[in-house]
C-alpha cells in the first residue's frame, strides 16, 4: 500500500500502480494592461452535487475573449482567456506526410519532495514540448478532510494511495497553474486509484459518474476544502477545459466511456496493449492507448510506460540491484526510441509514452523519459503535444485520409507526397 515516507512525500507503491498480472507485464511476442476581474457563481460545498457538466470542450481555435478574468465559485478556479501556447491545426492533403506526434503523459501530477512535476515542466519548456498531466483529484484534498471523498464500493475517505500534505497541495496548485499557462494539458487520473477487487474495472456507469463528479469537485472547491485562502485560483475553468483522462491501472474503460459521454470529453487514454497505429474512436471518443514497443535485445514488446519496464527488470520491487541501473536505464531509453524510430521512418502513427512521478530503481525511468524528450522533440517533423492537442488535430482531418493512415503497418516505409 502507499504511504507517507519520512520526508513527507506521497509514495505510490507497485501495488497501487499494478493491475492484474497479465496487464502489468503486458509483454507479448511480436515482430498589455491588467485584465479586469469578475466573480462568477456561488461557492459550492465539496459534498454537494456538482453542477451539470459543461458542453463538449471546443477544439483549439481560440474563442473571442473580452479581456476580463472571471473568478469562479469559491475562487478555486477562474477563466483567464484562451489557453496560451496552443499550436495551429493544419489539414493534411491526401498522401501528404503527417507530423510525427509524440505524447508524454503523467499519472498523478503531484509536486512532492522529489519535485518531479516542476522538473518535467522545465524539460518540456526547454524542448519545445507540451505534455499531459493527469491530476489525481484527492491530491487537492487534505488528509484531515479525507472523508469528503466518497469512493465507489469503498468507505468514505478510503483510497489506495496516500492523501497529500498541506504543503504538497500548495506546491501542486502552483505547478498546475504554471503548467497550464505554458500550454500543457491538465487531464484527470480520477481519485482513489482503486484497482482489481472493487476497482474501476468493477464499477458501473453510475459509479464512474460519481468518481468523475468528485474529480471535478475537488478541483472546483480546493479553497473551501484546504483553507488556502491566499493561494491564487487556478487559471482555467475545469468544467470547460477538462477533455479526458486515464483510469488507474487501465481498468474499466467500457463503463468509463459510457459515463464520459455526459461530460463532453474528447478522448480516453485508459486502454492498453495496442500496436503503434493511427488512433480510432470508441463510442465517439478518441482512444489513445498505451502501445507495444520493441524491447531492446529481445523478440518481445513492452507497454510504453515506466511500470512495465520495471516489471521486466526488477519484478515487483522498486529497489532492484543498483549495479543493473545503467543497463536498465539504457534498455528503457532505447525501448522508447525503438518505438519512435519505427513510426518516424514508417507510418508516422503517434507515439504515446505514459509515466508516473516516481523514483523507482534510482530514478532511471525519469531519466530515460528526459533523455527521450531531448532526443526527439526538436527533430524535423516532430511535434511533442498533449492528448488534447492531438485530438484537435485529428478532428480537423479528412476522415478518409485518417482511414488510409490506419491501414499502414507501423514500420511501413512510404514515399510521401511533399
Residue map of PLM features:
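Active-site-adjacent pocket scaffolds in enzyme catalytic domains
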Residues: 63-72, 150-166, 231-347, 398-409
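N-terminal export and membrane-targeting signals
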Residues: 1-18
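C-terminal region of N-terminal signal peptides and the immediate post-cleavage residues
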Residues: 3-4, 24-49
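Active-site beta->alpha N-cap acidic-glycine motif
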Residues: 69-185, 192-196, 216-218, 222-258, ...
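Active-site cleft segment of glycoside hydrolase catalytic domains centered on the general acid/base Glu
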Residues: 194-215
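Ser/Thr-rich, Proline-interspersed low-complexity disordered segments
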Residues: 41-64
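C-terminal domain-boundary segment and adjacent tail
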Residues: 78-81, 132, 267-280, 334-418
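Hydrophobic membrane-insertion alpha-helices, especially the h-region
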Residues: 14-28
Amino acid at each position: 500500500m502507499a504511504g507517507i515516507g519520512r520526508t513527507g512525500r506521497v509514495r505510490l507503491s507497485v501495488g497501487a500502480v499494478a493491475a492484474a498480472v497479465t496487464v502489468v507485464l503486458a509483454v507479448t511476442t511480436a515482430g498589455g494592461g491588467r485584465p479586469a476581474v469578475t466573480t462568477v457563481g456561488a461557492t459550492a460545498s465539496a459534498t454537494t452535487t456538482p453542477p451539470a457538466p459543461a458542453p463538449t470542450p471546443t477544439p483549439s481555435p481560440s474563442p473571442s475573449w473580452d479581456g476580463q478574468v472571471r473568478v469562479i465559485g469559491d475562487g478555486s478556479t477562474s477563466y483567464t482567456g484562451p489557453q496560451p501556447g496552443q499550436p495551429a491545426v493544419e489539414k493534411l492533403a491526401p498522401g501528404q506526410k503527417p507530423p510525427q506526434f509524440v505524447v508524454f503523459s503523467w499519472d498523478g501530477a503531484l509536486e512532492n519532495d522529489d519535485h518531479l512535476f516542476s522538473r518535467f515542466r522545465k524539460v518540456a519548456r526547454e524542448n519545445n514540448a507540451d505534455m499531459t498531466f493527469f491530476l489525481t483529484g484527492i491530491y487537492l484534498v487534505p488528509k484531515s478532510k479525507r472523508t469528503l471523498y466518497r469512493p465507489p464500493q469503498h468507505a468514505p475517505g478510503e483510497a489506495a494511495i496516500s492523501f497529500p500534505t498541506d504543503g504538497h497541495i500548495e506546491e501542486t496548485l502552483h505547478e498546475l497553474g504554471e503548467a497550464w499557462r505554458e500550454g500543457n494539458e491538465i487531464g484527470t487520473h480520477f481519485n482513489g486509484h482503486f484497482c482489481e477487487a472493487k476497482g474501476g474495472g468493477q464499477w458501473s456507469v453510475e459509479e464512474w459518474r460519481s468518481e468523475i463528479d468528485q474529480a471535478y469537485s475537488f478541483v472546483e472547491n480546493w479553497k473551501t476544502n484546504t483553507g488556502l485562502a491566499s493561494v491564487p485560483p487556478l487559471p482555467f475553468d475545469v468544467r470547460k477545459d477538462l477533455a479526458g483522462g486515464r483510469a488507474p491501472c487501465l481498468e474499466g474503460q467500457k463503463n468509463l466511456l459510457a459515463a464520459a459521454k455526459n461530460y463532453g470529453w474528447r478522448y480516453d487514454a485508459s486502454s492498453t496493449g495496442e500496436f503503434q497505429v493511427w488512433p480510432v474512436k470508441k463510442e465517439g471518443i478518441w482512444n489513445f492507448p498505451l502501445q507495444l514497443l520493441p524491447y531492446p535485445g529481445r523478440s518481445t514488446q513492452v507497454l510504453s510506460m515506466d511500470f512495465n519496464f520495471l516489471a521486466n527488470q526488477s519484478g515487483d520491487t522498486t529497489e532492484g540491484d543498483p549495479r543493473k541501473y545503467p543497463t536498465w536505464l539504457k534498455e528503457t531509453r532505447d525501448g522508447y526510441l525503438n518505438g519512435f524510430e519505427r513510426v518516424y521512418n514508417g507510418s508516422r502513427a503517434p507515439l504515446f509514452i505514459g509515466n508516473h512521478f516516481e523514483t523507482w530503481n534510482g530514478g532511471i525511468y525519469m531519466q530515460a523519459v528526459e533523455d527521450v524528450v531531448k532526443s526527439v522533440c526538436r527533430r524535423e517533423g516532430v511535434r511533442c503535444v498533449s492528448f488534447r492537442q492531438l485530438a484537435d488535430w485529428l478532428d480537423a482531418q479528412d476522415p478518409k485520409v485518417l482511414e488510409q493512415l490506419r491501414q499502414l503497418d507501423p514500420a511501413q516505409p512510404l514515399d510521401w507526397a511533399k
